[in-house]
Amino acid sequence: MSLSNKLSITDVDLKGKRVLIRVDFNVPLDENKKITNNQRIVGAIPTIKHALDNGAKAVVLMSHLGRPNGAVNPKYSLKPVVPELERLLGKPVTFARDCVGPEVESIVNDADNGAVILLENLRFHIEEEGSAKDKDGNKTKADKAKVEEFRKGLTALGDIYINDAFGTAHRAHSSMVGVDLPQKAAGFLMKKELDYFAKALESPQRPFLAILGGAKVSDKIQLIDNLLDKVDTLIVCGGMAFTFKKVLNNIPIGTSLFDEAGAKTCPSCREAKAKNVKLVLPVDYITADKFDKDANTGTATDESGIPDGWMGLDCGEKSIELYKEAIADAKTILWNGPAGVFEFDKFANGTKATLDAVVEGCKNGKIVIIGGGDTATVAAKYGVEDKLSHVSTGGGASLELLEGKELPGVVALSSK
């Protein structure tokens, strides 16, 4: 799956066409159905405006919201998105009470002069995800013929398909892979994601550094395996570093996080040497007597080990210097997972110092890519998203891409 040869919205002629766009409007709502964070809607505006500015007959927007489990549930209606979308676009938006069917088709076919239509939640139909769970966790599969019918219903609403929902690209859902139109192109959000991940995974400027943090090694096994073949330097930090320290260096880690399942793969990191990959691990630690923001703190080093009854929740100053050296040497930096428990101020220093170093690097021309999830939360917490080359919007999707997996929503796009 090449990331760099996919058709993009700027490659297609939209004039006079019904443009069907899969967006990600899965936004948080409060109890009064008011949007508490509009970032995802803001992110889709350039793609929608491009279609309107280039003469689209109509722009038809489809999205999911929450997990209604294949049934209509007013709690998850997309209707509350309409006022915010109208405000950001500066024009009226028609809301369709369903996402397929004759009523929706007639709304879409009657639209003209760049009308914008928002369809109701795709996941009100079991055919979108292909299955649903009841409250006891029992799974029901969607009927194959009905899934086909649903996909035909979506296809009937457009002449050109644009996918701008990178965060759902790892899901083979009907709206991601089942729209059967001759031209299927990436929107601006999707294109930016693909361009930056191609820069890292297909043609990185070297030296290429990956910083992998977070808690569990077992969550990152495939990621480590895939990246060991691509990077020049690998920093392993955060909670998962303690499993490496215990297994590879036999260092006492007290009550620090130890991942039994992940421990079995640490020896494979000895392969790093064979692959000429420099492996950087922390060498000193900020410790705590309990997992709590108000815990008593201490310090430990590799020489002393972490005493019984204490756990490492952040790295110390010497480790930060090692990370900074690796960042200074690199030209391409990919960061996935924090360097400590950044949610607690006492243990946020390692993550903050690493962030400061990559922001500085970016200012000096390095390519810095933040791979979604907790690390994107860190960038947002310190308000530096616009000071980095790219902060991914897809936690699960970016992780699967970095693991070397094909993303169904990307595979489904037309090639140039």
Swiss-Prot record:
It catalyses: (2R)-3-phosphoglycerate + ATP = (2R)-3-phospho-glyceroyl phosphate + ADP. Its cofactor is Mg(2+). It holds the Pfam family PGK. CDP binds at residues 214, 219, 238, 337, 339, 342. One of its GO terms (biological process) is gluconeogenesis. AMP binds at residues 215-216, 220, 239, 312, 343. It is found in: Cytoplasm; Mitochondrion. The keyword Nucleotide-binding applies. Catalyzes one of the two ATP producing reactions in the glycolytic pathway via the reversible conversion of 1,3-diphosphoglycerate to 3-phosphoglycerate. Both L- and D- forms of purine and pyrimidine nucleotides can be used as substrates, but the activity is much lower on pyrimidines. Negatively regulates the biosynthesis of acetyl-CoA from pyruvate in the mitochondrion. Belongs to the phosphoglycerate kinase family. This is Phosphoglycerate kinase. The lineage of its organism: Eukaryota, Fungi, Dikarya, Ascomycota, Pezizomycotina.
